[in-house]
């Protein structure tokens, strides 16, 4: 699985000032949205962006089915040719390891009160060019959800839940492996911090939790939980669970454990 991270940054960086190649607008494969692409590599990243444009309609549709249509009409995708470019464009901490990250959704500025975000873009790592079409679609859809939900997501939202819901939107259902039964605790942000297998498992567990909520309480229940637990001015998780799902955290965890082991 390609692991994804969403990050918001405070300072605006103009891509055009750093690179001679300016974004070229293309009409996306959906009625009311436009995709702008920036290739920072060579023919390799050009081909990657062509694949993204050709398949973007399905990603937009998946996000709209879950989140609705009231989000930005402008979609910018940047394809990087080196890990150094990826780190720069995605504003990643150079002291941390990002080799297992396929893409990042970033914004230069976010006004949650006004529900406005500027400088939003999806930045693809060099390894994205080697992905299959289905894997690339998952990556782009995952990051597109973060872009769509940006102004409805607090800076201190529980990352594991934002990532799990993004994977729910992006990934097709698949059987939960028997090994998942070994850990029935709720996911945590710490699960996503360690590079390698632990981070991959953390994303899987967050995804399974989102699937569980959708199975047990409906897709509308999952969306309500995201809004209550991750939205601006959100409650703590226990309160959000009661408000969105009508159960307490103890009952939720019990049902989650039964879902994993059932």
Task: Label every PLM stretch briefly.
Residues 15-30:
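N-terminal hydrophobic targeting segments that direct proteins to the cell envelope
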Residues 114, 134-139, 147, 151-262:
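Acidic/His/Gly-enriched intrinsically disordered linker/tail segments
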Residues 4, 49, 60, 252-260:
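Charged, low-complexity, helix-prone segments enriched in Lys/Glu/Asp/Gln
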Residues 1-17:
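Hydrophobic membrane-insertion alpha-helices, especially the h-region
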């Amino acid at each position: 699985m390609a692991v994804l991270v969403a990050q918001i940054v405070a300072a605006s960086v103009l891509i055009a000032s750093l690179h001679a190649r300016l974004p070229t607008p293309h009409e996306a494969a959906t009625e009311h949205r436009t995709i702008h692409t920036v290739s920072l590599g060579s023919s390799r990243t050009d081909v990657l962006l062509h694949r993204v444009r050709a398949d973007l309609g399905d990603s937009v549709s998946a996000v709209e089915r879950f989140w609705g249509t009231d989000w930005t009409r402008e979609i910018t995708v940047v394809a990087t040719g080196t890990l150094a470019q990826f780190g720069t464009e995605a504003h990643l901490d150079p002291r941390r390891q990002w080799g297992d990250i396929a893409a990042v959704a970033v914004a230069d500025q976010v006004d949650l009160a006004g529900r406005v975000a500027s400088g939003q873009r999806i930045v693809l790592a060099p390894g994205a060019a080697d992905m299959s079409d289905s894997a690339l679609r998952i990556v782009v859809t995952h990051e597109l959800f973060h872009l769509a939900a940006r102004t409805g997501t607090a800076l201190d939202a529980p990352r594991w839940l934002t990532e799990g819901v993004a994977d729910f939107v992006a990934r097709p259902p698949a059987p939960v492996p028997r090994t998942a039964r070994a850990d029935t605790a709720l996911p945590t942000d710490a699960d996503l911090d360690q590079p390698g297998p632990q981070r991959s498992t953390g994303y899987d567990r967050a995804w399974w939790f989102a699937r569980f909520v959708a199975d047990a309480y409906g897709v509308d229940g999952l969306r309500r939980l995201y809004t209550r637990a991750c939205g601006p001015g959100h409650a703590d998780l226990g309160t959000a669970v009661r408000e969105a799902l009508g159960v307490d955290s103890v009952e939720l965890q019990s049902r989650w454990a039964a879902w994993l082991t059932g």
